[in-house]
Amino acid sequence: MSFCSFFGGEVFQNHFEPGVYVCAKCSYELFSSHSKYAHSSPWPAFTETIHPDSVTKCPEKNRPEALKVSCGKCGNGLGHEFLNDGPKRGQSRFUIFSSSLKFVPKGKEAAASQGH
């Protein structure tokens, strides 16, 4: 398990429906279901963000392989990016708290962005 504290309630850990994961606070697009994959950690795992500015990154003290990630729009804390720990060589693993995400099913993206 990762060094993050596990709080439980990770509703998106085994959630693999097509769609987009957005920030729970501001609805900014963060991750596509295409980048989500099964991982042994208790948190949802993604390989990449939707936009280059979907998240902001801050080095994790005493952990050169980890970066704290926050929403690139509102600064809401999301979790961590673990460098070179993705499913393929050279990919990152974004380990994200379900409580920081909302899921928008495929085909409803426009309605979700208009509602914000």
From Swiss-Prot:
Keyword Cytoplasm part of the UniProt annotation: yes
A GO term, aspect molecular function: peptide-methionine (R)-S-oxide reductase activity
Subcellular location: Cytoplasm; Nucleus; Cytoplasm, Cytoskeleton
Cofactors demanded by this protein: Zn(2+)
Active site: 95 (nucleophile)
Alphabetically ordered keywords of this record: Cytoplasm, Cytoskeleton, Immunity, Innate immunity, Metal-binding, Nucleus, Oxidoreductase, Selenocysteine, Ubl conjugation, Zinc
Pfam families: SelR
Domain MsrB positions: 1-106
Catalytic reactions of this protein: L-methionyl-[protein] + [thioredoxin]-disulfide + H2O = L-methionyl-(R)-S-oxide-[protein] + [thioredoxin]-dithiol; [thioredoxin]-disulfide + L-methionine + H2O = L-methionine (R)-S-oxide + [thioredoxin]-dithiol
Amino acids binding Zn(2+): 23, 26, 71, 74
This enzyme's EC code(s): 1.8.4.12, 1.8.4.14
The organism's place on the tree of life at top rank: Eukaryota
InterPro entries: Met_Sox_Rdtase_MsrB_dom (IPR002579), MsrB_Met_sulfoxide_reductase (IPR052150), Mss4-like_sf (IPR011057)
Listed PROSITE patterns: MSRB (PS51790)
GO biological process: actin filament polymerization; innate immune response; protein repair
Record's GO cellular component terms: cytoplasm; cytoskeleton; nucleus
Note accompanying the cofactor annotation: Binds 1 zinc ion per subunit.
Coiled coil recorded as keyword: no
PTM description: Truncated MSRB1/SEPX1 proteins produced by failed UGA/Sec decoding are ubiquitinated by the CRL2(FEM1C) E3 ubiquitin-protein ligase complex.
Function, as annotated: Methionine-sulfoxide reductase that specifically reduces methionine (R)-sulfoxide back to methionine. While in many cases, methionine oxidation is the result of random oxidation following oxidative stress, methionine oxidation is also a post-translational modification that takes place on specific residue. Acts as a regulator of actin assembly by reducing methionine (R)-sulfoxide mediated by MICALs (MICAL1, MICAL2 or MICAL3) on actin, thereby promoting filament repolymerization. Plays a role in innate immunity by reducing oxidized actin, leading to actin repolymerization in macrophages.
Annotated family: Belongs to the MsrB Met sulfoxide reductase family.
PANTHER family to which the protein is assigned, alphabetical: METHIONINE-R-SULFOXIDE REDUCTASE B1
Name of this chain's protein: Methionine-R-sulfoxide reductase B1
Species of origin: Mus musculus
Primary gene name: Msrb1
